[in-house]
């Protein structure tokens, strides 16, 4: 299955972007080539840019606390697996405590490092990190992979609490919805939301439908999924076939 996700608000959009960046950072960090570690470092800069939103930390702390309170109230429910419930509550408390203990803006360690700041400012310029622009960075790229990796891990370490909080919030959000099979008649599907508030929509397609691309939009009254199809280098065109897919609406 191929999964498309659509956030209903800016907060979830920011968390999804952070998740994507952290996954990219993980992928390139374990590689060996200097160019791959260059991508890891520039991805770390992107994480800092996205995480620099002033109210992100407070939003995450509020959400972690709200989830903890909601789940704590379920301890009296005999139909709930109490061991699994306790494990999630403990995870929420740990994530909240670690995030609370962080000081300053996200990525402050990078902002305070003049050398990293110089790389960051040049990295936004096409071809701006050549050896004649940043000879010290060029030399760093020739260190053994283990040393480069250790450096990037050290610089990313202060962002781990933010990452952990982001991951658990998104995980619980995704687990909150129920998936159902629907059909986009003539390539189009719409559904009234009837006043219900959602934060995330998931569209899953079979691998056999890989050529169909969903274009998703929504407001507080209705959601739309329109399928298009790419034909070589041409602009995607609307599809007029009936397309089955899995739809999941998620809200805490």
From Swiss-Prot:
Compartments, as annotated in UniProt: Cytoplasm
Gene3D superfamilies: YacF-like, YacF-like domains
GO terms classed as biological process: division septum assembly; FtsZ-dependent cytokinesis
A Pfam family the protein falls into: ZapD
GO CC annotation: cell division site; cytoplasm
Main location group: cytoplasm
UniProt keyword annotations, A-Z: Cell cycle, Cell division, Cytoplasm, Septation
UniProt-listed InterPro entries: ZapD (IPR009777), ZapD_C (IPR027462), ZapD_sf (IPR036268)
Matching HAMAP family: ZapD
Oligomeric and partner information: Interacts with FtsZ.
Family: Belongs to the ZapD family.
Function: Cell division factor that enhances FtsZ-ring assembly. Directly interacts with FtsZ and promotes bundling of FtsZ protofilaments, with a reduction in FtsZ GTPase activity.
Protein name: Cell division protein ZapD
Organism name: Ralstonia pickettii (strain 12J)
Gene this chain is encoded by: zapD
């Amino acid at each position: 299955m191929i999964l498309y996700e659509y956030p209903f608000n800016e907060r979830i959009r920011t968390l999804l972007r952070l998740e994507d960046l952290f996954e990219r950072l993980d992928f390139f960090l374990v590689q060996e080539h200097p160019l791959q570690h260059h991508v890891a470092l520039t991805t770390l800069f992107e994480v800092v840019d996205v995480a620099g939103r002033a109210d992100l930390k407070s939003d995450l702390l509020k959400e972690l606390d709200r989830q903890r309170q909601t789940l704590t109230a379920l301890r009296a429910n005999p139909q709930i697996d109490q061991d699994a419930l306790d494990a999630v509550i403990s995870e929420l408390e740990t994530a909240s405590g670690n995030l609370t203990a962080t000081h300053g803006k996200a990525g402050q360690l990078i902002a305070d490092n003049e050398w990293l700041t110089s790389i960051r400012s040049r990295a936004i310029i096409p071809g701006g990190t050549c050896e004649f622009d940043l000879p010290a960075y060029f030399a760093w790229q020739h260190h053994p992979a283990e040393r480069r990796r250790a450096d990037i891990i050290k610089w990313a370490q202060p962002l781990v609490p933010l990452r952990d909080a982001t991951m658990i919030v998104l995980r619980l959000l995704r687990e909150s919805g129920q998936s159902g099979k629907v059909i986009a008649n003539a390539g189009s599907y719409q559904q009234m939301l009837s006043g219900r508030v959602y934060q995330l929509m998931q569209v899953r397609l079979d691998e056999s439908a890989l050529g169909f691309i969903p274009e998703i939009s929504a407001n507080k009254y209705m959601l739309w999924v329109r399928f298009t199809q790419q034909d070589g280098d041409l602009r995607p065109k609307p599809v007029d076939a009936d397309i089955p897919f899995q739809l999941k609406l998620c809200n805490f």
